[in-house]
C-alpha cells in the first residue's frame, strides 16, 4: 500500500507540520505582551532582527540569482528551479521562525509573572513553531518537487539530479545565515561584555549598555534563524542524498528505496508533534527533564512507526527489512548519545565545566588553557559514537544503511530545533525582564529557563555536527557512485599513492581551518567596532550611567548589520569556488580527496569549537551562581575572558563549518557531468 500512497503520506505529514506551526504561532501571539516598557524593548529587538534579516536575504538573493543562471546554463533548468526552491524554503523557515521568536520573548517574560509552567509553555511553543516549520517546509520541498517532476514523466535519474539543486539552494542560505548571524550575534555579545561587564562593571542585559539591544537581536538571528537554516539544509540534504543513494545501490527495489526516507521523515513529524505535547513543567519540576521527556517520547513513537513502514516498503531488498530497521534505530540511538555527550561537556553540573571554572581562580591564562584542553578532549566521544554508528549501519545495510541511519537521526530535527529555538526566547525574556525592571520573582523564573536554554543550544549544535558528518559521508558515497555511473569504463579508487588524491586531501583539510580563521577574525573586527561605539557613547553621553540619558541602541545594531553582511560574503563563497577549481584543474580523484579531507578536519574542528565554547560560557555562569567567589571576583573576570574567546568559537566559526562540509560535497556532486 505504501508504495502507492507513501509520497502522499509524506506530503500530508509535511502540511500537518506547517499547520501545527501556524496554529501555535496564533496561540503565542494571542498571549499578553506585558506593560508599555516591555513592549517598547520588544519592538526594538523585533525591528533590529527584521532589518538585519532583510539586508541578509537581499545580499544572498544577488549571489543566488547569479548561481541560478549558472546552474541553469551548465547543468539543467530543472536543477536551477530546485536550487531556487531550496533557497526560498530555507530562508522562509528561518524568517518565520525568527519573527515568532521575537514575539514569544516578551510574552514569556510576561507569562513568568504567573509561574514557571506558563512561561515554559510560551517559550517552548515559540521554539516548536520553528522546529516544525523546518521539517514541514523541508519535507514539503523535497517530496513536493519530486512529485511534480514525476508527474511530468521525467526519468528517475533526472528527477534526483534536480533535487540535488534543491540541496544546493538550501546549503547556500544555510552558510550565509550561520556565518552572517554568527558574526552579528557574537560581535554584539563580545562588545557588550568587554565594555559593559569588564570596563563599566554593569550586569548583563543592563539597559544602560548601548549594545544590549544588539545583543538580544543577535540571539535571534544567530540561534533561531541561523540554526533553522542549518538544520533545514541538513534535513533536506540527507533525505535527498539517501534517495539518490537508494536509486544507485538498490535499483532492484524499484522506487521503494527512493520513497522510504520520505515516509520515515513523514511519520517522524507526527511523532514530534505528539512529543511536543508532553513538554510540561510544574513548579519545582525539572525544566531539562521536561524537554528531554518530549524528545524521548518522539524517539520512541518514531521507532515504533518505523517497523511497519520498513516491512511494507523494504521487505524485498537485498539487506532485508529487519536489517534496515536496525539502521534506523542506530540513527535514533546516535541522536541520544550525541545529546548526552554534549550535555556532559557543557553542563554546569558536570566535571569539565567545573574544571574550567576552577582554573579561572588562578587567572585568565589558566582559564584559556583549561578551555582549550576541554575543547580538544571533547572530540573523542562524539567521533567514537559516529564511527560506531557508521560501522553498525554499514554492517546491517551497506552504504544505504548509513544513509538510513542519517535520515532517522535527522527525522528528529523538529524536536531538536524546538529545543534550540527555545534558547533565544528565554534569553531574550530574561533580558526584557531586566531592562523593564520587573520584580525579582520574574527573574527567578526566567533565569533557570535561560540556564537550561544555554544547555539546549549547546546540545543542538552537537546534534547538528554529528548529523552533518553522516550527511557528508552519504553525499561522498553519492559522488563516487555518480562518478562511476557517468564513466563506467573508468575505475575510480581514491588511492593514497596517487599524488592528486594527496593534494586534494591536504587542500580539503585546510579549508575548515581557513574558513574558521576568517569567521573568528570577522567577529574580532565587529566586536572591536562595537567596543569603540559603546565607549564613545559612555564618554559623550555621561548621563547614560546615571540613568538620565538614553543610549543610542540603533547605532550598534546598524553597525553590526553592515559589518556582518560585508564579512560573510567571501568565506561563504569559499566552499563553492574551491571544489570547482580543484575538480576542473586536478580532476575527479583530487576532488574526492578534497571531500574526505574536509569531512575529517571539519568534523573535529566543529566539535572542538562548539563544545569548548559552550564549556567556557557555562564556566562563567557556574561562577556567577556563587562558586569560586561569584560575580565580580577575580575568577569571574578570568571566566569572562574565556567566554569572550568561546563566544565566536561556539556560535560563529564552529556551527558554520556544518554547512561548509555539505556545500563542498554538493558542489562536487553537481560537477560530476562536467568532469
Swiss-Prot record:
Keywords: Calcium, Cell inner membrane, Cell membrane, Hydrogen ion transport, Ion transport, Magnesium, Membrane, Metal-binding, Translocase, Transmembrane, Transmembrane helix, Transport. Mg(2+) 1 binds at residues 189, 193. Its cofactor is Mg(2+). The record marks 178, 223, 230, 651, 662 as: Important for ion transport. Its EC number is 7.1.3.1. The keyword Chloroplast does not apply. GO terms for molecular function: diphosphate hydrolysis-driven proton transmembrane transporter activity; inorganic diphosphate phosphatase activity; magnesium ion binding. Ca(2+) binds at residues 617, 643, 647. Disulfide bonds: none annotated. It holds the Pfam family H_PPase. The record marks 457 as: Determinant of potassium independence. Substrate binds at residues 186, 650. It is a multi-pass membrane protein. Its main location: membrane. Mg(2+) 2 binds at residues 216, 219, 427. InterPro entries: PPase-energised_H-pump. It catalyses: diphosphate + H2O + H(+)(in) = 2 phosphate + 2 H(+)(out). The chain crosses the membrane at residues 5-25, 65-85, 129-149, 164-184, 231-251, 258-278, 287-307, 321-341, 384-404, 405-425, 458-478, 500-520, 568-588, 590-610, 655-675. It is found in: Cell inner membrane. GO terms for cellular component: plasma membrane. Proton pump that utilizes the energy of pyrophosphate hydrolysis as the driving force for proton movement across the membrane. Generates a proton motive force. NCBIfam families: PRK00733.1-2, PRK00733.2-1, PRK00733.3-5, V_PPase. Belongs to the H(+)-translocating pyrophosphatase (TC 3.A.10) family. K(+)-insensitive subfamily. Homodimer. This is K(+)-insensitive pyrophosphate-energized proton pump. It comes from Xanthomonas axonopodis pv. citri (strain 306).
